């Protein structure tokens, strides 16, 4: 025995030295890591609380907390493990063998344990001192408090103590049973050490055999034999689940319990002093990540995510690392401290989230409400002005109440409808804040409303002034006024929408002025003077008014003919007068249409076309905007606009569908109306237009893009101006004659219809293009050369011709034509999408060879849109993205072209087979 005692003393002294040196290492290396990881463990719990599928809904929160290695176990990380000092830590060490790595220090721990059991005094003196040094001095375990915690809870303690420890005990026993096979491994420890440990641990086992059915004995065997074996040591980063187990040993055997407590404290102190390997930490982190639902995450990424979330818990957890809870009242304070933390993050954090989100959304809504309030006030002002106009005219319009409803209500409706929609979208009951965000852009701000209100007043008041002149024209037009009303309302909607979205107030004013000028066609000379004055005021627009008036006039005359044919000429003059006066109210917006259409080539039908020019007006408006942007206003682009534009307008959100369809049909008769001897100057232009239209393929491009820099364009514009002046002169004469002789319009319509069929054939293909994008691609490429020649685009013409030659087959690299000059400006071609595309590139050819499912291609294209929306993206990346997107659009465009050609071939074959 004396030899054994001496050996044990030597071992203890050597182990003390090793422990002291290791303690320093621990403080320097592991303590920092353990403390940081302790914060991260707490953050894991917080993440679990905040996770989408909150674990509390699926698992018992007490079990979840402990099973995550948090509540009591994480305190050990801070270096102040209180509960681990209790005897069942043997079981925990066994449990944790799964997570830790074998180290040579385990032999030291085993020897220390044997020495402890041999002499309680040396064990108590040295190891208690070690424990106090390693662990915080305040950490004195109170056996009286600990002994009551495992399976029964006194009334004075928190009720969560029992479920916490008991559930953890159950989990540990199950896990230890699974690990029992590994417990048989031999460490290479001397039998003496094992015997000594057996003696000391038999005392411990006596108290536990009753409760745990020798599971703890198995655990002890694991811990004992695992000292020098490959069985991994318990991770010092986690405290045992059954930390309070040995308290009940104290009830039965006070001496043995004190020995076991001291022994456990000593063993834990040694474990704590052992430097923690990275593998220990990583395994612990993986375990935590698995329990937190963050599976398959390596320790580094997990630690990063936890450090991100650490801001939540650092303020409250750091000043009191969970080890401090342990210090005197482990039973009560630990459970309650955990419940406090859990309560904060499980309840308060979600509540705070639910509170903060409504606050933010309510702030947003209040912001929208302010806008809505402003817009409503503006609406009221606008409506008041409209009501005044109505009151002035109601006396005249008693006979036409229906028309008043049709016109006045839609006149107001654009504001109301959009505002109501925005209110519904941004109402507090809106589904999400995304809706509110986008509604913010949809809604009209007070500034927009002010602009619209000012424009409304500016438009409507002068209409009254010109009632006399308009009446002169309207008396001669019986049925046209009926068409004017819906068109006027449509124009109001369109103009308002244009203003609301584009905010081009100057353009709207200009067009309204042009409308006034064209409306009063009886006084065309006076109107021209006014136009000249306004054109002087608007220098930027002066360049385009004559051209667009010409183009509009042709369309308006067409519509007038339609109106004459559609409307009954037998209506009484009194009703005509009333309708005239009423139309004057809303003609302000239709005015451009009337003027543009009546003054040009269709002088005979220009006066009736005033009412029906809504769609034409919208088209003219679009063409003007395009002209202002691109600077191109040749005669032929106008003609092209007159034809396909009505159909595009038919699909566009601005125009009335019926009117636009009619204009499609009538636009060519209108354009041929000037074939009368009166309009010889306009005949030449229309012949040109007819030739162009005949040369066009069946499907015309939705948009014709041309360079604004070409000199030929300027020449055409000058010629168009001259011809438009001739038109205006001839149309004035013709307008007067037609105002006197309304019947001529019918004859003109008949002539135009007789002459129209060739052009109508071309136009019938235009609606097909607008309606079916699949058919567009073919005409796009075939029609590109035609437009290039028509518009004489110097830079864009050659590429357009080239693209038009592309065959309806799978593209190859030979089809790609590189520009002659390295940095020449981008050349565009018309596409089936309604907007121009750059020329074919190698990327498109490659995409043909590697086609993806269409849903994948669409998803990639949408993603590229999202990426482009990132303002922080570099310029090069933006260019690459846009190049890819254009290449994809070229791919789709050409495939549509191929499909259309194949479809045409099938139809031809069917036609051939039928006869």
UniProtKB/Swiss-Prot annotation:
Interacts with BCY1, DBP5, GFD1 and SKG6. GO terms for biological process: cell wall organization; establishment of cell polarity; heterochromatin formation; mRNA export from nucleus; positive regulation of G2/M transition of mitotic cell cycle; regulation of protein localization. Residues 202-212, 313-327, 464-480, 531-541, 552-562, 711-721, 742-751 have a biased composition (Basic and acidic residues). The modification Phosphoserine is found at residue 229. GO terms for cellular component: cellular bud neck; cellular bud tip; cytoplasm; incipient cellular bud site. Keywords: Cell wall biogenesis/degradation, Cytoplasm, mRNA transport, Phosphoprotein, Transport. Residues 115-125, 696-710, 752-793 have a biased composition (Polar residues). Residues 74-93, 565-574, 597-609, 668-679 have a biased composition (Low complexity). 'ZDS' means 'zillion different screens' as both ZDS1 and ZDS2 have been found by a wide variety of genetic screens. Present with 279 molecules/cell in log phase SD medium. It is found in: Cytoplasm. GO terms for molecular function: protein phosphatase inhibitor activity. Residues 1-28, 69-134, 179-261, 310-330, 412-433, 464-807 are annotated as: Disordered. Residues 243-252, 515-530 have a biased composition (Acidic residues). Pfam families: Zds_C (PF08632). This is Protein ZDS1. Has a role in establishing cell polarity. Together with cAMP-dependent protein kinase regulatory subunit BCY1, provides a negative feedback control on the cell wall integrity-signaling pathway by acting as a negative regulator of MAP kinase SLT2/MPK1. In heat-stressed cells appears to play a role in localizing BCY1 to the cytoplasm. Seems to interact with, and down-regulate, CDC42. Also acts as a suppressor of PKC1. May act as an integration point for distinct signaling pathways helping to maintain a balance among these different pathways. SMART domains: Zds_C (SM01327). It comes from the Eukaryota. To yeast ZDS2/MCS1. Residues 618-627, 642-656 have a biased composition (Basic residues).
């Amino acid at each position: 025995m004396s030899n054994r005692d001496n050996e044990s003393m030597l071992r203890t002294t050597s182990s003390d030295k090793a422990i002291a040196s290791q303690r320093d290492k621990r403080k320097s290396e592991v303590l920092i890591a353990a403390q940081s990881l302790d914060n991260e463990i707490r953050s894991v719990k917080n993440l679990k609380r905040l996770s989408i599928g909150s674990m509390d809904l699926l698992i018992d929160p007490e079990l979840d907390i402990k099973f995550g290695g948090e509540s009591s176990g994480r305190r050990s990380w801070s270096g102040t493990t209180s509960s681990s000092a209790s005897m069942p830590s043997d079981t925990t060490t066994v449990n944790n063998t799964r997570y830790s790595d074998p180290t040579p220090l385990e032999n030291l721990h085993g020897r220390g344990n044997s020495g402890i059991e041999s002499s309680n005094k040396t064990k108590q003196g040295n190891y208690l001192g070690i424990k106090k040094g390693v662990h915080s001095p305040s950490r004195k375990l109170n056996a009286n408090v600990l002994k009551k915690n495992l399976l029964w809870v006194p009334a004075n303690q928190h009720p969560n103590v029992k479920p916490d420890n008991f559930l953890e005990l159950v989990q540990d026993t199950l896990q230890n049973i699974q690990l029992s096979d590994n417990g048989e491994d031999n460490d290479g420890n001397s039998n003496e050490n094992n015997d000594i440990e057996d003696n000391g641990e038999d005392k411990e086992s006596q108290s536990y055999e009753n409760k745990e059915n020798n599971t703890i004995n198995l655990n002890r065997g694991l811990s004992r034999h695992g000292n020098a074996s490959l069985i991994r040591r318990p991770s010092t980063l986690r405290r045992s689940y059954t930390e309070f187990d040995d308290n009940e040993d104290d009830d039965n055997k006070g001496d043995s319990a004190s020995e076991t407590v001291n022994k456990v404290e000593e063993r834990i102190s040694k474990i704590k002093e052992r430097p923690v390997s990275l593998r220990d930490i990583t395994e612990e982190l993986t375990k935590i990540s698995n329990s937190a639902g963050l599976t398959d995450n390596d320790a580094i990424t997990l630690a990063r995510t936890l450090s991100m979330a650490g801001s939540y818990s650092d303020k409250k957890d750091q000043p009191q690392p969970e080890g401090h809870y342990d210090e005197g009242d482990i039973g009560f304070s630990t459970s309650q401290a955990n419940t406090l933390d859990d309560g904060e993050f499980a309840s308060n954090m979600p509540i705070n989230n639910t509170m903060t989100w409504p606050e933010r959304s309510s702030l947003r809504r209040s912001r929208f409400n302010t806008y809505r309030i402003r817009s409503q006030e503006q609406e009221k002002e606008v409506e008041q002005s409209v009501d005044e106009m109505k009151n002035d005219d109601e006396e005249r319009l008693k006979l036409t109440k229906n028309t008043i409803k049709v016109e006045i209500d839609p006149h107001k409706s654009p504001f109301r409808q959009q505002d109501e929609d925005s209110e519904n979208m941004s109402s507090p009951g809106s589904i999400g804040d995304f809706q509110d965000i986008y509604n913010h852009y949809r809604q009209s701000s007070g500034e927009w409303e002010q602009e619209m209100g000012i424009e409304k007043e500016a438009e409507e008041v002068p209409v009254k002034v010109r009632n006399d002149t308009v009446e002169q024209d309207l008396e001669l037009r019986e049925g046209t006024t009926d068409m004017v009303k819906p068109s006027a309302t449509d124009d109001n909607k369109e103009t308002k929408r244009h203003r609301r979205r584009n905010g081009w107030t100057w353009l709207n004013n200009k067009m309204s002025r042009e409308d006034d000028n064209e409306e009063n066609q009886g006084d065309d000379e006076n109107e021209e003077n006014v136009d000249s004055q306004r054109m002087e005021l608007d220098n930027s627009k002066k360049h385009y008014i004559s051209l667009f008036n010409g183009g509009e006039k042709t369309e308006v005359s067409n519509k007038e003919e339609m109106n004459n044919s559609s409307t009954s000429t037998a209506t009484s003059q009194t009703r005509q007068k009333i309708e005239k006066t009423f139309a004057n109210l809303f003609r302000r917006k239709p005015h451009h249409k009337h003027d543009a259409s009546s003054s040009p080539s269709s002088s005979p039908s220009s006066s009736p076309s005033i009412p029906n020019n809504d769609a034409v007006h919208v088209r003219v408006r679009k063409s003007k905007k395009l002209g202002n942007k691109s600077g191109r206003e040749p005669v032929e682009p106008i003609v092209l606009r007159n034809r396909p534009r009505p159909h595009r307008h038919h699909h566009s959100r601005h125009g009335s569908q019926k009117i636009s369809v009619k204009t499609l049909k009538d636009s060519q008769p209108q354009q041929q109306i000037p074939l009368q001897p009166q309009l010889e100057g306009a005949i030449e232009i229309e012949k040109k237009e007819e030739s162009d239209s005949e040369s066009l393929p069946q499907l015309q491009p939705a948009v014709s893009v041309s360079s604004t820099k070409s000199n030929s364009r300027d020449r055409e514009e000058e010629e168009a101006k001259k011809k438009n002046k001739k038109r205006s002169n001839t149309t004035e004469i013709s307008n007067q004659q037609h105002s006197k002789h309304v019947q001529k319009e019918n004859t003109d319509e008949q002539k135009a219809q007789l002459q129209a069929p060739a052009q109508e054939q071309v136009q019938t293909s235009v609606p097909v293009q607008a309606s079916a994008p699949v058919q567009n691609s073919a005409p796009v490429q075939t029609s590109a050369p035609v437009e290039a020649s028509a518009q004489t685009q110097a830079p864009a013409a050659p590429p357009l011709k080239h693209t038009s030659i592309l065959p309806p087959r799978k593209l190859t690299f030979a089809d790609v034509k590189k520009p002659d000059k390295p940095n020449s400006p981008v050349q565009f071609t018309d596409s089936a999408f309604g907007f121009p595309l750059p020329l074919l590139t190698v990327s498109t050819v490659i995409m043909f060879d590697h086609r993806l499912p269409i849903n994948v291609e669409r998803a990639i294209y949408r993603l590229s849109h999202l990426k482009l929306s990132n303002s922080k993206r570099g310029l090069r990346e933006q260019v690459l993205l846009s190049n890819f997107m254009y290449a994809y659009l070229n791919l789709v465009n050409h495939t549509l072209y191929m499909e259309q050609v194949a479809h045409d071939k099938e139809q031809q074959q069917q036609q051939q087979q039928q006869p």
